[in-house]
Amino acid sequence: MAATTTLRSPKIPHPPPESTPSNLSYLSQISLTPVPKRRRFISIYACSNAESNSQFGSEIKKSQAIELNKVSDEHPYEFNSKDSPNPLPRPLTSADLSNMATEGSRLRVAYQGVRGAYSESAAEKAYPNCEAVPCEQFDTAFEAVERWLVDRAVLPIENSLGGSIHRNYDLLLRHRLHIVGEVKLAIRHCLLANNGVKIEDLKRVLSHPQALAQCENNLTKLGLVREAVDDTAGAAKYIAFQQLKDAGAVASLAAARIYGLNVLAQDIQDDSDNVTRFLMLAREPIIPGTDKPFKTSVVFSLDEGPGVLFKALAVFAMRNINLTKIESRPLQKQALRVLDDSADGFPKYFPYLFYVDFEASMADQRAQNALGHLKEFATFLRVLGSYPSDSGIA
């Protein structure tokens, strides 16, 4: 029978805010409010070294699912660790936070995917010696941080070949997490297969859609049918647990080691300069400084009108602030706006949110002046984070 531990969620006093620029607002309080008489599952995987021959998608011990069940007001939260020897640690309390520096507690860092994912490598690069906690979905990682189940999340935001991860841009706006850093990781894809399987035996290859797209030319030369799955390491785990002889996986060297697969070919990506940028997310912003290169990320919306976007970008140019990225996303729940100011018809346009990264710290007066200027004509403005830039690629 699965061991069940019921934890009541304490009201956690929020740490007193320190002196920061006004653009970086702190959350007033963290509390976990249960939904009465309704069950909701958040699947977070807790890693285990136990061996298992279970099929992919069933209850497996190498990467065991932890279910967080909202059951009622009387029993706010239950953790069901199905035969897992390493259940997810309890949520942090304010006492935990104060003891972390003195006792050397390991940070718990959420990432999307299963063990062997590139995101796991990014989490370990961002926070060496951390306890990496795999999550089933991007949403789960955001919620895990907000609910104090983990301390940080490291999630991809863009790839040099595949472009932006639009889902995570939308989640940044829906949640109140702060960007506290970035990490860039070189992506080196490998073609993996089970023991005894040769390249000529393969008929199909499984991986994440972006990984398949990044290796398109090489996979086409091999004549392999491409099948998309949720993540690269998940593909490796699937062919290993199913003992497939006609299928390979595009994944990392780490995934090959974890799931006992042979590496048939290395560096099969079409472009050797394949880099993914990950964001480091936390419940609280960091205090920006000027002692090292900083980057600031903001999101804003604008009213309609000629030259409005030009004016918005000009507030940075006139202060000699370099923009490193601009991304537009349709405004949720307002996908289409109709104007009736013309007798000839109803002009339609899509209102957009603009995500901008620029090279300046919020401790820099230029950045504060630029955002103050932008706020004069922006209909919405939010600072997502001001954090040290990552210039190194590993």
Curated annotation (Swiss-Prot):
Entry-linked CDD domains: ACT_CM-PDT (cd04905), PBP2_Ct-PDT_like (cd13631)
Instruction: State its Enzyme Commission number(s).
Output: 4.2.1.91, 4.2.1.51
All copies of the ACT domain together span 297-388
Domain Prephenate dehydratase: start-end pairs: 108-283
- A GO CC term assigned to this protein in UniProt: chloroplast stroma
The organelle targeting sequence, given as a residue range: 1-47
GO terms in the biological process aspect are: L-phenylalanine biosynthetic process
PROSITE patterns, alphabetized: ACT, PREPHENATE_DEHYDR_1, PREPHENATE_DEHYDR_2, PREPHENATE_DEHYDR_3
Q: What Pfam families does its record include?
A: PDT (PF00800)
Reactions catalysed, semicolon-separated, are: prephenate + H(+) = 3-phenylpyruvate + CO2 + H2O; L-arogenate + H(+) = L-phenylalanine + CO2 + H2O
Q: What does this protein do?
A: Converts the prephenate and L-arogenate produced from the shikimate-chorismate pathway into 3-phenylpyruvate and phenylalanine (Phe), respectively. Involved in floral volatile benzenoids and phenylpropanoids (FVBP) production.
For this entry, the protein name equals Arogenate dehydratase 2
To which species is this protein native? Petunia hybrida (Petunia)
The top of its lineage is: Eukaryota, Viridiplantae, Streptophyta, Embryophyta, Tracheophyta
